[in-house]
Every structure is written in C-alpha cells, then in structure tokens.
Amino acid sequence: MFTTIKKTVIGLFTIVRSMWMVNSHAIRPRDTILYPEVPVPVPPRFRGRIILSRDPDGDERCVACNLCAVACPVGCISLQKAEREDGRWYPEFFRINFSRCIFCGLCEEACPTTAIQMTPDFEMSEYVRQDLVYEKEHLLISGPGKYPDYNYYRVTGMAVADKPKGAAQNEAAPIDLRSLLP
C-alpha cells in the first residue's frame, strides 16, 4: 500500500512538472525569428560577400598581383593581368565562384592594395549555380570601402605619371648620396 501511494505521488508530481514546463514555454519569447521580415543581426567582424573597392581617386585598386588567387584554399578566384598605357596593372577579368568560396577571408588578408574587402552581406542565394559566379562588374563598388584614405600608389612610392621623383604629393626630393661623402 505504501508503494502504491508513493507511485501515485511521483506520477502526480511528474504530470504537474510537465504541465508547468509546457505552460512556462508558452508565455516565453520565441527563439525563432521570421527571417526575411526581421533582419539577422551579424557581428561586427562578420565575413560575408567579397567586393572590389576603388581608390579615393576613383581608379580600381586591384593591381592583378594574383596574391588573392594563391591564398585562396579552394581556388575560387581567377583573374588575368593587363597593363594600361601609363604602365599600371589592372585585372582584365576578375572572377569569383561563390559556390566554392568558404568565406575564410584569406584573400582580403593577402591583398596588398586593400582592393578585396569582405562585407556583412550574406544573402546570395540563387536558383541557378552559374549565377553564383561573379565577374568584375558585379564585384566593383563605386567607393573606397573600409579604407577611404588608403591609396596603394601613394603609400608604396610608385612613380606618378608625368611627375619626377620627389614631385608627387607628400614626397620629398631624392637625396644625392655623393653629396654626403667626405
């Protein structure tokens, strides 16, 4: 008789506890969100879609050095180098296959000109796989991106067309080493 009462009390406690849990979850805020209507919060350093940025002057920053394609662990970046009349290199074509990209950010780290930048945009779903191959026209943006004042050619000291050494902006005239000899 004692075991029957014990089993009945344990059974009632289990039922009351289960009902309490169900009712407490009914009034709690929902864990799931309605995705298209409610935007997903992304962290500040989120690595999303890749873009190609421009210099503050408006020229494209990419010098087709191919470091991004070499750094990519899955080989989803391909480009071909060409040269302008002033001697500056540029990519004739720049192609990223986002169906293979793992968004690791190694291409952004390898880029010496900060042309490749990762954005927080992650909505790139397509019905056709070939639409995930982005060309240079799709990747280029009109602004400088994350680094608005950075210009690769000014930082590296590359010769500016139609200006001798030392005549460019923020550049000192070269020193004559023979004048320093005793």
Swiss-Prot record:
The record's section on PANTHER family has: NADH DEHYDROGENASE [UBIQUINONE] IRON-SULFUR PROTEIN 8, MITOCHONDRIAL (PTHR10849:SF20), NADH DEHYDROGENASE UBIQUINONE IRON-SULFUR PROTEIN 8, MITOCHONDRIAL (PTHR10849)
Q: What does this protein do?
A: NDH-1 shuttles electrons from NADH, via FMN and iron-sulfur (Fe-S) centers, to quinones in the respiratory chain. The immediate electron acceptor for the enzyme in this species is believed to be ubiquinone. Couples the redox reaction to proton translocation (for every two electrons transferred, four hydrogen ions are translocated across the cytoplasmic membrane), and thus conserves the redox energy in a proton gradient.
Any one GO CC term of the record: plasma membrane
Iron found in the keyword field: yes
- UniProt source species: Psychrobacter arcticus (strain DSM 17307 / VKM B-2377 / 273-4)
S-S bonds: none
Q: Which family does it belong to?
A: Belongs to the complex I 23 kDa subunit family.
The protein's annotated catalytic reaction(s) are: a quinone + NADH + 5 H(+)(in) = a quinol + NAD(+) + 4 H(+)(out)
Positions contributing to [4Fe-4S] cluster 2 binding: C72, C101, C104, C107
- Domain of life according to the entry: Bacteria
Q: A Gene Ontology molecular-function term? A: NADH:ubiquinone reductase (non-electrogenic) activity
The gene behind this protein is nuoI
- Places the protein is found: Cell inner membrane
Its GO biological process terms? Answer: aerobic respiration
Cofactor: how bound: Binds 2 [4Fe-4S] clusters per subunit.
Major place of localization?
A: membrane
Q: Which residues form the 4Fe-4S ferredoxin-type domain?
A: 50-82, 92-121
Enumerate the cofactors the protein uses. [4Fe-4S] cluster
Q: What is the name attached to this protein's record?
A: NADH-quinone oxidoreductase subunit I
Provide the residue positions that the database annotates as binding [4Fe-4S] cluster 1. Answer: C62, C65, C68, C111
Which keywords annotate this record? 4Fe-4S, Cell inner membrane, Cell membrane, Iron, Iron-sulfur, Membrane, Metal-binding, NAD, Quinone, Repeat, Translocase, Ubiquinone
> According to the UniProt entry, what is the EC number of this protein?
7.1.1.-
Q: What is the lineage of its organism?
A: Bacteria, Pseudomonadati, Pseudomonadota, Gammaproteobacteria, Moraxellales
